[in-house]
C-alpha cells in the first residue's frame, strides 16, 4: 500500500460530535437554570402582586365600609372568590407563558441537535467551516429569543398589573353600584307600599263616598215622601175643616226636647173648646175640660134635685091652692116669678149640658185618636230601637271583622315584602356568583 497523500488531517467525527453535544448540553443546562430562575422570579412577583392587590382591596373595603355594611357577611366570600379567580387567571397566564417559553426553548435547542444528527448521517466534506458557522448562528438565536421573551414578559406583566388594578377598581365600582341599586330598590319598595296604602285609602274613601251618596239619595227619597204626606195631610185638613193644634212641652218640663210632628188635627169647635181651656199641653187642657165636665155634671145633678123639690112643692101648692085661693093671690105672682126663673135656669143648664156632652164626645174621640197615634208611635219607636240595636251590633261585628282582616292583610304584606327582599338578595348573590364564575 502506498502512503497517504499530503493534506489537512481530519478530526475524528466522534470527537467532534461529542464536543458539540457537550456544548449544547451546557447551553441547555444554562437555559434551564435561567428558566427556573425566571419562574421563581415570576412566582415571587405574583406573590407580591397578590399582596398588593389584597392591600388595595382592604383599603377600598375600609373606605366603602359605610356603603357596603349591608353585605358584610357576603363580602369575605366574594373577596376570597375574587382572589381565587385572580390567582387562577395569574396561574393560567404564567403557565401559558411557561409553556410558550419552554416550547421556544425546546425548539431552539433541539434544532441544532437535529441539524447535527442530519449532518452526521451525510458524508463528511471539506466545508466543515461553513457548518460550524451555521451551528454558531443557531446557538446565538436562543439569546435573542430570550431577550424578546423578557421584553414581552415584562410588557405582559405591566399589562397584567394594570388589568388587576383596573379590575379591583371596577369591582369597587360594581359594589358601590350594587349598594346604590339595593338602596334604590328599598326606596322603590317603600314608595310602592305608600302608593298601595294611598290606593287603599282612596278606595275606602270612594266606598265611603258611595255609601254617603246612597244614604243621601235614600234620605232625599224619604224627604220627598214626607213632603207628599204633609201635602196630603194639609189637603185633608182643609177639606174637612180641621185645625192643627201643636202640643206644648209635656207636664211643664222645660228641658224636655220637643217631639217632631207632635201636632193634633181637631175640628174648629174642638179647637175653640181647647182654646177656652187655656194654654198648655194637650193632656193638661183635656184634664181641665174633664174637671169642668165633672163640675157641670155635679151642678146638673144638684139642679135636677132642686127641680124635683120644686115640682113636689108645686104639686103640694096646687093641692092647697083651692083652699088658699084668696090668701095666695099675692104669693102666686111670686111663685110664677120663681118658676120662670127656675125654668130659665133649667133651660140654660140643659143647653150647657148638651154642649158639654158634645164637647166631651169630641174630646173623647180626639183622646182615642191620640191614644192610637201614641200607640203607633210607641210601636214604631220600639221597632226603630230594636233595628238600631241590631244595626249597632252588626256594625260592631263588621268593625271587628274589618280590623281582623286589616291585621291579616298587614301581616301578609309584611311577609310578602320580606320574601321579596330575600328573593332580590338571592338574585343579586346569584348574579354576583355567575359574574365571578
From Swiss-Prot:
Protein name listed in UniProt: Leucine-rich repeat flightless-interacting protein 2
Biological process terms in GO annotation: MyD88-dependent toll-like receptor 4 signaling pathway; MyD88-independent toll-like receptor signaling pathway; positive regulation of tumor necrosis factor production; regulation of DNA-templated transcription; Wnt signaling pathway
Coiled coil location: 22-49, 143-239, 282-430
Chain positions covered by the region annotation Disordered: 33-152
Sequence ranges of Basic and acidic residues compositional bias: 33-62, 77-105
Source superkingdom: Eukaryota
Biased composition (Polar residues): 63-74, 110-139
Phosphoserine modifications at: 18, 114, 117, 125, 129, 133, 137-138
Family: Belongs to the LRRFIP family.
Keywords in alphabetical order: Coiled coil, Phosphoprotein, Wnt signaling pathway
SUBUNIT field: Interacts with DVL3 and FLII. Weakly interacts with MYD88 in resting cells. Following LPS-stimulation, the interaction with MYD88 is rapidly enhanced; the complex gradually dissociates to basal levels after 6 hours of stimulation. Interaction with MYD88 is regulated by LPS-induced phosphorylation. In the presence of LPS, competes with FLII for MYD88-binding.
Known role: May function as activator of the canonical Wnt signaling pathway, in association with DVL3, upstream of CTNNB1/beta-catenin. Positively regulates Toll-like receptor (TLR) signaling in response to agonist probably by competing with the negative FLII regulator for MYD88-binding.
Residues with PTM Phosphothreonine: 136
Pfam family, one: LRRFIP
Any one GO molecular-function label of the UniProt entry: LRR domain binding
Amino acid at each position: 500500500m502506498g502512503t497517504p497523500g499530503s493534506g489537512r488531517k481530519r478530526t475524528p467525527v466522534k470527537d467532534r460530535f461529542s464536543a458539540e453535544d457537550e456544548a449544547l448540553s451546557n447551553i441547555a443546562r444554562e437555559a434551564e437554570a435561567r428558566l427556573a430562575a425566571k419562574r421563581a422570579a415570576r412566582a415571587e412577583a405574583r406573590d407580591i402582586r397578590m399582596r398588593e392587590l389584597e392591600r388595595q382591596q382592604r383599603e377600598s373595603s375600609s373606605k366603602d365600609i359605610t356603603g357596603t355594611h349591608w353585605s358584610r357577611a357576603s363580602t369575605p366570600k366574594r373577596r376570597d372568590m375574587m382572589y381565587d379567580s385572580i390567582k387562577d387567571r395569574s396561574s393560567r397566564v404564567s403557565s401559558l407563558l411557561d409553556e410558550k417559553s419552554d416550547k421556544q426553548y425546546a425548539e431552539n435547542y433541539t434544532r441544532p441537535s437535529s441539524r447535527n444528527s442530519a449532518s452526521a448521517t451525510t458524508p463528511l466534506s471539506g466545508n466543515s467551516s461553513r457548518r460550524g458557522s451555521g451551528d454558531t448562528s443557531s446557538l446565538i438565536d436562543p439569546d435573542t429569543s430570550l431577550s424578546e421573551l423578557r421584553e414581552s414578559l415584562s410588557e405582559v406583566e405591566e399589562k397584567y398589573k394594570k388589568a388587576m388594578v383596573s379590575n379591583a377598581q371596577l369591582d369597587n365600582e360594581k359594589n358601590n353600584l350594587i349598594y346604590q341599586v339595593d338602596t334604590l330598590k328599598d326606596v322603590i319598595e317603600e314608595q310602592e307600599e305608600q302608593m298601595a296604602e294611598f290606593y287603599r285609602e282612596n278606595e275606602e274613601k270612594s266606598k265611603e263616598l258611595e255609601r254617603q251618596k246612597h244614604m243621601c239619595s235614600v234620605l232625599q227619597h224619604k224627604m220627598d215622601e214626607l213632603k207628599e204626606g204633609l201635602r196630603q195631610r194639609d189637603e185633608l185638613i182643609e177639606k174637612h175643616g180641621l185645625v192643627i193644634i201643636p202640643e206644648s212641652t209635656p207636664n211643664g218640663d222645660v228641658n224636655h226636647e220637643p217631639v217632631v210632628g207632635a201636632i193634633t188635627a181637631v175640628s174648629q169647635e174642638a179647637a175653640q173648646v181647647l182654646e177656652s181651656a187655656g194654654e198648655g199641653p194637650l193632656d193638661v187642657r183635656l184634664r181641665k175640660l174633664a174637671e169642668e165636665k165633672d163640675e157641670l155634671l155635679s151642678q146638673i145633678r144638684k139642679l135636677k134635685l132642686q127641680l124635683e123639690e120644686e115640682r113636689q112643692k108645686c104639686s103640694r101648692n096646687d093641692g092647697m091652692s083651692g083652699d088658699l085661693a084668696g090668701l095666695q093671690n099675692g104669693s102666686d105672682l111670686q111663685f110664677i116669678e120663681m118658676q120662670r126663673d127656675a125654668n130659665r135656669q133649667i133651660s140654660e143648664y140643659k143647653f150647657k149640658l148638651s154642649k158639654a156632652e158634645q164637647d166631651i164626645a169630641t174630646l173623647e174621640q180626639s183622646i182615642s185618636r191620640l191614644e192610637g197615634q201614641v200607640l203607633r208611635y210607641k210601636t214604631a219607636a220600639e221597632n226603630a230601637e230594636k233595628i238600631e240595636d241590631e244595626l249597632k251590633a252588626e256594625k260592631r261585628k263588621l268593625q271587628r271583622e274589618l280590623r281582623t282582616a286589616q291585621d291579616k292583610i298587614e301581616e301578609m304584606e309584611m311577609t310578602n315584602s320580606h320574601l321579596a327582599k330575600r328573593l332580590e338578595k338571592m338574585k343579586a348573590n346569584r348574579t354576583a356568583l355567575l359574574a365571578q364564575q
